[in-house]
Every structure is written in C-alpha cells, then in structure tokens.
Amino acid sequence: MSFAATTKKELTQLETDLCCSKAELAALIRMNGSLSFVNKQLGLDVTTENAAIARRIYTLIKKVFPMMFVELLVRKKMRLKKNNVYLVRLKQEAETLLKELKIIGEGFQIHRTISTDIVSATCCRRAYLRGAFLAGGSINHPETSSYHLEIFSLYEEHNESLCELMNSFQLNAKKLERKKGFITYIKESEKITEFLNIIGAHQALLYFEDVRIMKDMRNSVNRLVNCETANLNKTVGAALRQVENIKFLDQEIGLDALPTKLREIAELRLKHQDVTLKELGEMVESGKVSKSGVNHRLRKIDELAEKLRAGVPAESSSPR
C-alpha cells in the first residue's frame, strides 16, 4: 500500500462531530459526485476506487442525514486494471442533501466555491480539507527525491477556493492548471507535515517526520563523506605530484644540489609518501617544522621542477 493510501485509510477511521462530518462530506461529494436525472428525479452518485473512502462517504451521509436512503454499490471496471469501482448512490432526496451542503442553490445552480457556512469554524475548515484530500489528494512517499502534496479539482473556482482555505493555515499552498483540471499543491516538507496535522493524519505525520529526519541525516553524512573524500583526493594528488617533482629534480640535478631545508623535506617525502604535511614536519631531524612551513618548502620544490621543465637553467632557478 502506498503512503498516500495508508494516509487516507487512517483518515477514514477518524471520529468527527456533526458539523465537521458535514464539512468533510461536502468536499467528498463536491469533488467525487456526479448528478443525473431519472424520471424527473435528481440522483447523486459519489464514485471512488477506494473501498474505505466509499464506506466513509456512506457513513457520513447516514450520520448527517440519518433518514435518507443510501445505497453502496460495487462495479467492476472493464478497462485497464479492471479495479472495483464503488458507488454511493442517492436516488431520492439528493437535492435536499446538495442544498444542505451548499453545493447547489435554488434552481439547481451549482456553487463552485466553498461556502463560508460550511467552514465557519476552524474544526470544519480542517474537516473540509480532510474530505478534499480523501477525494482528490496525493502525497509523495517521504523517501522520494522531492516532497510533494497536491489536491486535484475539476473546476478552477473550487481550486482557488481550496487554495485560499489551505493558506488560511499559512501552508504556502500554490495553484497550477493541469491538462484535465487544476491542482493546489505544497512542496515544503514542514508545510506538508503541518497539513497532515491539520487534517488529523497523525500516524502518517509521525512516519513522514521519521523518514524525513533519517533522510536528512543520510544526506548530511553523504555530504560529509563526499567532502572528506574530495579533501583526501586533493591530498593524495598533491603528494603524488610532489613525489614526481622530487624524482624529476633528483634525476636532473640531484637532490644534493638543493638547499638543505628543501633537501630534508624532499628526502622525507620520498620515504613517506602517504603521511600528512603535519606528520612530515615532525620527522625533520633539525627540528620540527609547522604544516605551513612544510607546505612552503614543497611549493618551492614544485616551482623549481616546473622551471627546469620549462628550460630555465638550474643555477638561476635554485631557491635561496
């Protein structure tokens, strides 16, 4: 089961007050519902491929409208994966339900935006967002390369209204048009965890945070290892270059031709090619030399070798 599916399953098990049940139901029906007229009677089908969400819709309708007759049907998809499709159907009193949820007005006028009457309380704003996520939401697993949570809407007006509702909780949500509709999305991991908290997905929130922290720790360790590796490669590369230059000088003019301080370091570097500059300085018999002092002498040796390669006579290139 995907992280999004696990999160939705958790949400379908939450207990809610009547006002919040109404708000959540309004989002689910607005986003997943379809209307039909049969024998001059308005009917409502709410469709989903998620059995837990279908049961949630059925339960919420019976809670908010206990006297209404509701059917829960199962159909088999005939195309592609042939998954089950679940229908929550109202053949009667659909108009009453839709008006009560502020989805339609008089004359069957459909309201595309979220009614303030439905989300007047903070708890109901949270519940509407929960219903919207159940109906059209998705969330990346926190292990993936990028954090992303989105809610899909067919209609631009509802998408704008939904984005405003999310941002009433300072979630920094943004809107985007898609090929077949519109989305409101969040990219920041901290805001995604806030959203999960708002809609009541606390187990999903804890899992998301655990994975995110471990992921950040791994990334920090990897950056540190990469940095250490780069430094090591740089050190090894410098040591190999120094040895190569010292051997070149030995072949061309002999190490005895070097000033005493340079010769000491040159001979030590040839004998101890894998030690650090600090360790090399501690091996000087005439007295310890600092890391910067060793580095200075080796630079002089490098410069001398480069001058000799360029054809500068040894006498004029010898450091004083």
UniProtKB/Swiss-Prot annotation:
MF terms in GO: DNA binding
Keywords linked to the UniProt accession: Cell cycle, Cell division, DNA-binding
DNA-binding region(s) in UniProt: 276-310
Alphabetized SUPFAM superfamilies for the sequence: Homing endonucleases
Record-linked Pfam families: HTH_WhiA, LAGLIDADG_WhiA, WhiA_N
One Gene Ontology biological process: cell division
Function: Involved in cell division and chromosome segregation.
Family designation: Belongs to the WhiA family.
NCBIfam families: DNA_bind_WhiA
Descriptive protein name: Probable cell division protein WhiA
Phylogenetic lineage: Bacteria, Bacillati, Bacillota, Bacilli, Bacillales
Gene: whiA
